[in-house]
Amino acid sequence: MDKSQGVLLSSNVGAGSRPWPELLGSAHWDGLLDPLDLTLRRLILLCGDLCQVTYDSFNSDSHSKYCGTCRFSRSTLLDRTQFPAAGDLSVAAYLYATSDATAFPGSMVYSMSREAWSKESNWIGYVAVSNDAAAAASGQRVIYVAWRGTIRSLEWVDVLKPDLVDHDDILPEGHPGRGRSRVMKGWYLIYSSTDERSPFSKYSARDQMLAAVRELVARYRNESLGVVCTGHSLGASLATLCAFDIVVNGVSKVGDGAHIPVTAVVFGSPQIGNPEFKKQFEEQPNLRALHVRNMPDLIPLYPSGLLGYANVGKTLQVDSKKSPYVKRDTSPGDYHNLQGILHTVAGWNGKDGEFKLQVKRSVALVNKSSGFLKDSNLVPESWWVERNKGMVLGQNGEWQLEGPAEENLPVPPVVTGKIIDDDVAAVATSSSAKEDKKTGKGSKLLSGLIDQLLCVPDTCKAGAA
């Protein structure tokens, strides 16, 4: 990855550049999308790379006892995944989710081992914050919430029921959306479900996220603050819900003062809720959403207005077919692949402009979890893999799956009391890291179309959904 992108949080933001409020959508990105502003382009890519971290670090091997976990500790996550701005951010909290397997097929993966770390929970994302050096250079302390998308192929779309449910449980008393605003059941269950059987899901992913963000807002209340929620595919839906939740429940309010800006920057997002949810979202004065959509990608059309859904926020539409580096005849999953979208953003010069990379970004990243690049680029398909798929030769001469080092073992989240320990707080303030329901009516209206258009090979890897 392009390590120079790390300067986004320092020299590229501030004097002579777009101020943070504009980047976070204070003016709804008017004049910044066409042509695409360079600093906004870098911010979008940074958010996309934060999403990619969730794919690159997730253990999806069902043979492993630790399937469903993050492979790395909070203190090493960004470095081990070669995140380009690792020196500017510190990971403050991990998020874990649970859900009924029938609510969202493919969203959770579990170990086949009897000694599995958990049979109920999956790692679903993380909360990070800019450190002192980056905050001082940019004049803005930014809290990032990154949500993981699905690991399975796009076949989930064919079996997922697009039922709409109310989300009154997360709306404050007296909120005008109570009983009217509805979101897809699958997204909502992953976001809000708990399972007492698992120490990782005694609190919902929502509760874990709110506790972490609330703590960071309180810690940095005297600084210029912003919150960015980001995700791809399923993660985009969770990020949109998350941003809305932070605002309507007052987590973005600093004491008795004004609300800080909260922005969802999402990629390849399915539709989240009904027109009332859209209305309630867009009426919040400090809440924005920017959806980066690849035009040939079909997922953002799902479930569709025919089933009672509406798009939320502003859309930056790009078209990967303009890139000379990628295949023209490819599977639908490639158009939805996160790295394919980020590659297109890096070279996007408008629908009438010629594709030309505007920032230094390796073309090889496109094939990180796909075969989207033309063979003439000489980049192997799906090249981001664990060495020997995690197999090691033991002293007894037997090959076996290697477990994580002690510092990388999953640790249950703490939500009550002080949720960010002193070591992690020190990391956040240092430029060098230390150790850290009501169901609506579903519909099969789209099933025939989906059968035809989303027939994705089983070889679809992480980042394709």
Swiss-Prot record:
GO CC, alphabetical: cytoplasm
Matching entries from CDD domains are given as: Lipase_3 (cd00519)
What is the annotated localization of this protein? Cytoplasm
List the catalytic residues. 233 (acyl-ester intermediate), 233 (charge relay system), 297 (charge relay system), 336 (charge relay system)
* Main localization (coarse): cytoplasm
Q: Which SUPFAM superfamilies does the protein's record reference?
A: alpha/beta-Hydrolases
Under InterPro entries, the record lists: AB_hydrolase_fold, Fungal_lipase-type, PLA
GO biological process terms, semicolon-separated: cellular response to UV-B; lipid catabolic process; UV protection
Q: What is its EC number?
A: 3.1.1.-
> Which key words are in the record?
Cytoplasm, Hydrolase, Lipid degradation, Lipid metabolism
Question: A Gene Ontology molecular-function term?
Answer: phospholipase A1 activity
Q: Does the keyword Cell cycle apply?
A: no
What role is this protein assigned? Acylhydrolase that catalyzes the hydrolysis of phospholipids at the sn-1 position.
Give the record's family classification: Belongs to the AB hydrolase superfamily. Lipase family.
Query: What is this protein's record name?
Result: Phospholipase A1-II 5
